[in-house]
Amino acid sequence: MVFVACGLNHKTAPIHVREKVALQPAMQDSLLSSLLDLPEVNEAAILSTCNRTEIYCDTNTPEVLGNWLAHEHQLSEELLSQFLYIHQGKEGIKHTLRVASGLDSMMIGEPQILGQMKQAYQHACRLGTVKTQLRPVFEYIFRASKRIRTRSGIGANPVSIAYAAVQLIGQLFKNYHSLSVFLIGSGETASLVAKYLHQHGVHRFLIASRTLENAQKLAETFDGKTLSIGDIPQYLPLADVVISATACPLPFINKSLVEHALEQRNHAPMFLLDLAVPRDIEGNVNELEQVHLYNVDDLQSMIEKGMDERRNAALQAEQLIESELDNYIRWHRSLRAKDVICDYRNQMHTLAQQELQRALKKISAGQNQQDVLNEFSMRLVNKLTHNPTIGLRQMAWDNREDLLDLARYLFDTTANQSLYEEIS
């Protein structure tokens, strides 16, 4: 088997090229089937995201992949070749490990790519385009990339405002499930924070927007309650977390409003995230006890620190990839002996069963058990060593000292001799 990773990504191709070769879900089955129709391709899976389209396959002629991609997407082969990369064998495994570990992502260490690769693999398995050759390779890559991410900590530090906000909320409130979140405004970042919180188990959302239609859409997404901007004073005491991102020219959440909400909450802690510029929440709100107010600048400093830490983690992850790559090479080489080992063990098992059945029949017939066991052990030793003995004699006749040395290593005769000397 020759493992090949072929494709293009955000580093090698502009978006107007990437979007032309992006794999639409409705096309997935037909494209995989078309790829497997190529006589040169034995097995394959296709990963397609907004930042990359990659083919992972077993083929001895990887040049057919670029031709196939160009034909399927009605592109010039000459044009596509400018953006295409092809990694074979060890380099193909290394590239795929880097992708799965998040090292090749636009945002270093992002976790989504591993899940996307697993989905692509599972779909190919269901379709039957990944079988015995690629299956163990993918399973190894998934295990190895998980170890790399865990040991390097590459995904541990926030590198987006939304992710940083969710981490801060998690530090203040240990249980996401019990939180009530008040979302004011319907901007992209605020919605993304709400999405992440929902994924972490938050189920109670209050949503207010100057445009009622936008609030209703978000409420449907998160199964929340739709409110108007005028409802904020009434419902603010119910919120453990407030995320505000409107386009108001002046702050509309002031210290007295939050202080009143705290009194009604019996001074239970509140987390306020102001994503608006200009700000929606007055800065002196942070003077109140049990109030944790963060704005965009606060989160940006966290992100810059997180990026530095991720870059350091990426250096460690690259070293871990080299180690995992060595492990893969050893594992893959060991597969070449798998059939020989299996056949040899089956042969030995068959011989042992034959001799065991012969001995049991003699014991059932009333023969002396000790005599039968002695004969059994002698016959078993003779049968197990018959073929190796013939081979060793042939090596000696042919003056193949190199093979005799190999036999000494395989049979570990030196160790056995030392053992016999200790026993005697």
Curated annotation (Swiss-Prot):
One Gene Ontology MF term: glutamyl-tRNA reductase activity
Residues the entry annotates as binding NADP(+): G185, S186, G187, E188, T189, A190
Active site: C50 (nucleophile)
InterPro entries, per database record: 4pyrrol_synth_GluRdtase, 4pyrrol_synth_GluRdtase_dimer, 4pyrrol_synth_GluRdtase_N, GluRdtase_dimer_dom_sf, GluRdtase_N_sf, NAD(P)-bd_dom_sf, Shikm_DH/Glu-tRNA_Rdtase
GO terms under biological process: protoporphyrinogen IX biosynthetic process from glutamate
Pathway this chain belongs to: Porphyrin-containing compound metabolism; protoporphyrin-IX biosynthesis; 5-aminolevulinate from L-glutamyl-tRNA(Glu): step 1/2
Positions of substrate binding: T49, C50, N51, R52, S105, E110, P111, Q112, Q116
Other comment: During catalysis, the active site Cys acts as a nucleophile attacking the alpha-carbonyl group of tRNA-bound glutamate with the formation of a thioester intermediate between enzyme and glutamate, and the concomitant release of tRNA(Glu). The thioester intermediate is finally reduced by direct hydride transfer from NADPH, to form the product GSA.
Family: Belongs to the glutamyl-tRNA reductase family.
Protein name: Glutamyl-tRNA reductase
This protein's encoding gene: hemA
